[in-house]
Design a protein with these regions (language model features):
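Short, surface-exposed "cap/lid" segments of acyl-processing enzymes
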Residues: 1-31, 169-172
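Short amphipathic alpha-helical segments and helix-helix/interface helices
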Residues: 2-4, 116, 149-150
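Extracellular/periplasmic catalytic domains that process cell-envelope and extracellular macromolecules
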Residues: 6-8, 96-99, 120, 152-156
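Alpha/beta-hydrolase active-site loop
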Residues: 33-96
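Sec/Tat-exported extracytoplasmic proteins
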Residues: 72-79, 122, 131, 218
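Conserved hydrolase catalytic core segment
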Residues: 117-126
């Protein structure tokens, strides 16, 4: 699977759980001004102005940054020789205590959108997006935060990779989002194999026939 491909590429692999009980697409319903603050709320575990009211009760320990920081600290303490400590750096608070430049951020669907936004806000080693990003307006245009005119600390033209499958009806806008980000053709793979055990949207994560694409993006 995708995680095994990461291990085989020589990476430390961490699958993170966080608050994701409602899809960003459902929460924002095509409202361009909603997508970015909704995602920032989930990343930081702190409600941001402009985010949908459904997220008002989010707790800091439900956010991506706090959970990633906590997981890295636990792994560094419990597996002292495992190399996890290299992903931590002295800082104040979770977000500034993560060694972002050493981390490859990846995600599927909603998680891929989070990965893209983390890459905008932090200089990471690489961003890998599977069947994503999906943020699109009611006019089927990529959300404004995805445009290459925005200031990205990780350059999408150099360090963003993506995989999508033909016929993805859950996230039909992923290819337009890749173009908006300014990703080169070689980093945009829209030819994922769909296998018998998965529909198009899940194929980029679940179908082993895509192992060669995973390896290319992760190495």
């Amino acid at each position: 699977n995708f995680y095994v491909s990461g291990r085989d590429a020589g990476l430390h692999v961490l699958g993170l759980s966080y608050r994701s009980d409602k899809a960003i697409g459902q929460l924002c319903a095509g409202s361009d001004s909603c997508f970015e603050p909704a995602r920032e709320t989930i990343l930081r575990g702190q409600f941001q102005g402009g985010a949908p009211t459904d997220l008002q009760g989010i707790a800091s320990d439900e956010g991506v940054y706090e959970r990633l920081y906590a997981a890295l600290r636990i792994l560094a303490a419990s597996d002292a020789n495992g190399g996890w400590a290299e992903y931590l750096t002295p800082g104040v608070g979770a977000e500034s205590s993560i060694a972002w430049s050493k981390i490859l951020i990846s995600g599927h669907s909603q998680g891929g959108g989070h990965a893209a936004l983390i890459g905008r806000d932090h200089a990471v080693a690489r961003v890998v997006m599977l069947s994503s990003p999906c943020d699109a307006t009611r006019n089927d245009l990529p959300a404004s935060w995805l445009t290459k005119s925005a200031v990205y600390k990780t350059d999408p033209a150099l360090n963003y990779q993506a995989l999508g499958a033909p016929g993805d009806t859950i996230c039909p806008s992923y290819a337009a989002a890749w173009l908006a980000l300014g990703m080169p053709a070689g980093a945009r793979r829209a030819d994922a194999t769909v296998c018998a055990s998965s529909a198009a949207h899940g194929a980029t994560l679940a179908c082993p026939e895509n192992a060669s694409a995973w390896g290319a993006m992760l190495r």
